[in-house]
Swiss-Prot record:
Record's keyword annotation contains NADP: no
Subcellular location: Cytoplasm
InterPro entries, sorted: TLDc_dom
Family per record: Belongs to the RTC5 family.
Superkingdom to which the source organism belongs: Eukaryota
Keyword Nuclease: no
GO annotation, cellular component aspect: cytoplasm; nucleus
Keywords carried by this UniProt record: Cytoplasm
GO biological process, one term: response to oxidative stress
PROSITE patterns, alphabetized: TLDC
Task performed by this protein: May be involved in a process influencing telomere capping.
Protein name per the record: Restriction of telomere capping protein 5
């Protein structure tokens, strides 16, 4: 009888709603300051719609409050993501209504504050974000290859994706924090269907990520309307297409599967979602909080205005723009880029020569970013055309690899992050392990530096062996042997970018079978390819602030003073005619420039 009584007194298990409330309370206590919680409550109170005395947020309300531009068409995508994450950790209950507790959970997860509560081995939210954007439709995810010989491989890939989506570590960590055992039924609920992010939906979301990338705390998405109008909008779409191409081949599949999603982010876009933190932290700053209010009878001065924001890109270039800057921030720290870049060299303005490049760039004593864009050379007509193209083709090894993509006369954009000051190279290259070779257009890709092969960067002036001059990344430096000096063929590295000395042509090589040289092979394009292109523009941007720019200006000023002093040599006589006669005797001026005699 005692056993029966003890069983009757055992508390009933908590419902999903009660567990969600408990998790929200844990997050609120551990992840927010009292002021942030107060602000969130005030914001929610001002935005919430009510039904039966229950407040919640609608799609349009969230988009309007966050200043999401209508032109992107991303509001439904954002709302789907938020209502899915609001059901955390019971994701099978999604979509959830967006009450105050649900918004606490959403903001905690989207701003990475959950790391303060959940165990460290569950720090990655990539799987959660994928699920929040995905659709679960077997028909959508079935590729055309399933109808032919690719059926087995497609099924194996789908099985791998299902296995990868099982046992979400973040969900398990949340249940651990609650002291709750996750049922097997819930654990495998969403893995029973094919999960895929449709390409069009993901394109819109990438455009939003590009837009929010430079946001500061309390920053507004509408602070720069030029980014979503005219040329700015076109640049945003171009960058989004290049990034989407890394995830998806639309000719083969209509959407992005999880294994591809996680692989591309880990290898090429490690900071892709960082802009979501300031975006969702915007809920934590209430405009009703006025710290400028004084005592009784005083109020905030009506003449006080917020200081104008500094533009994220101070200078302009033919390659660099705000969207390219955001794209690079997905693999380079934002504190190196936003409001920190200065245009050091632009071929369009300074001339396409290594001399101009050296004069403008070599005095910058901080990291730099080189960008080069051009148009792909067509194999036949360009090879046999007039001009310098045939000479360029003759200087390269015979083509062994196909092009990286199928577009004719397609625009190509490559870049290199150079972590140390530039210098002339003779037998040894410079750069180091932090050097990054990357492609921005028409596909986003990354090639990180090797720690074993040191042939990272070479800057060789034109000499008696002109075919070996130029700027190269990943190519072996010139050898001292006579056979090498006599050779007219440039030695290309397995993964390399080469620009000729006139900055007229370039060549990018990706020898996947070699497994890389000074740079590792691509993690997302596991095949050989080569791009030969006519250069349209070259730019070098300095990473740094006012101190670096001041140091460079001082070096330039010193060189200008020295050059002027050498030009104005005072011969000491004060007699112009006598000085001229002396210079004529020395053979330095006049018609008899034969020099003087020591006899």
């Amino acid at each position: 009888m005692g056993q029966v009584l003890s069983e009757e007194r055992k508390p009933a298990p908590l419902s999903h709603e009660e567990l969600v409330k408990e998790l929200a309370n844990i997050f609120a206590d551990k992840c927010f300051t009292p002021l942030e919680l107060y602000s969130l409550k005030q914001v929610f109170k001002s935005l919430a719609h009510h039904e039966q005395h229950v407040g919640y947020l609608k799609e349009g309300t969230i988009a309007t409050y966050l200043n999401v531009p209508d032109i992107l068409g991303v509001s439904p995508v954002l709302f789907q993501m938020v209502t899915y994450i609001a059901a955390f950790p019971f994701l099978e209950d999604a979509p959830a209504f967006l009450g105050l507790q649900q918004m606490v959970i959403v903001i905690t997860l989207m701003t990475d504050r959950y790391r303060r509560v959940l165990r460290k081995d569950a720090a990655d939210k990539t799987k959660l974000l994928f699920k929040s954007l995905a659709v679960y439709d077997r028909k959508l995810s079935r590729p055309a290859a399933d109808m032919h010989s690719g059926l087995t491989n497609a099924r194996e890939q789908a099985g791998n994706d299902r296995q990868a989506l099982d046992n979400d570590e973040l969900v398990l960590a949340a249940f651990d924090a609650l002291g709750h055992v996750i049922p097997d039924k819930q654990q495998n609920m969403l893995a029973t269907h094919e999960a895929m992010i449709p390409g069009d939906k993901f394109r819109k979301f990438i455009m939003l990520l590009l837009l929010v990338a430079p946001l500061d705390p309390q920053g507004r998405l509408d602070s720069d309307p030029n980014r979503v109008t005219g040329t700015g909008l076109q640049c945003l779409r171009t960058a989004a297409e290049s990034i989407l191409a890394a995830f998806l081949d639309v000719e083969r599949k209509p959407g992005v599967e999880y294994l591809r999603f996680s692989k591309v982010i880990a290898s090429c876009l490690p900071f892709l979602f960082r802009g979501l933190t300031p975006l969702f932290e915007y809920f934590l700053f209430s405009e009703e909080l006025d710290f400028h209010k004084g005592k009784k009878g005083t109020s905030r001065s009506p003449t006080m205005f917020p200081e104008p924001e500094q533009p994220i890109l101070q200078d302009t270039g033919s390659i660099m723009n705000a969207s390219i800057l955001s794209q690079m921030s997905f693999f380079l720290p934002g504190n190196l880029l936003f409001r920190r870049l200065r245009l050091l060299y632009a071929g369009d303005e300074d001339g396409f020569s290594m001399g101009s490049f050296e004069a403008k760039v070599f005095k910058w004593k901080a990291p730099t970013i080189l960008l080069v864009c051009g148009t792909r050379l067509r194999d036949d007509s360009d090879h046999h055309s007039n001009g310098s193209a045939p000479a360029f083709w003759a200087s390269l090894p015979p083509r062994r690899f196909p092009r990286g993509s199928s577009g004719e006369a397609e625009r190509l954009t490559f870049g290199v992050y150079v972590p140390e000051p530039w210098k002339l190279t003779h037998r040894d290259c410079f750069g180091g392990e932090d050097t990054i070779l990357f492609q921005l257009e028409p596909i986003h890709d990354l090639f990180r530096a090797s720690s074993l092969n040191k042939d990272h960067i070479s800057f060789a002036r034109p000499s008696a062996s002109p075919s070996h001059a130029g700027v190269s990344f990943g190519c072996p430096p010139p050898r001292p042997s006579q056979a090498y000096r006599r050779s007219s063929i440039i030695a290309l590295g397995p993964v390399s970018l080469m620009l000729d000395s006139s900055f007229e042509f370039g060549c990018f090589t990706h020898d996947y079978a070699s497994k890389g040289g000074a740079f590792h092979t691509s993690m997302i394009r596991e095949y050989d390819f080569q791009e030969r292109f006519e250069i349209g523009s070259v730019e070098v941007w300095g990473c740094g602030g006012d101190e670096e720019a001041k140091d460079q200006a001082e070096r330039w000023a010193w060189e200008a003073r020295e050059a002027e002093a050498r030009r104005r040599i005072n011969l000491g006589t004060g007699d112009i005619e006598a000085d001229r006669a002396l210079l004529e005797m020395a053979g330095l001026i006049g018609s008899n420039r034969n020099g003087g005699s020591m006899a």
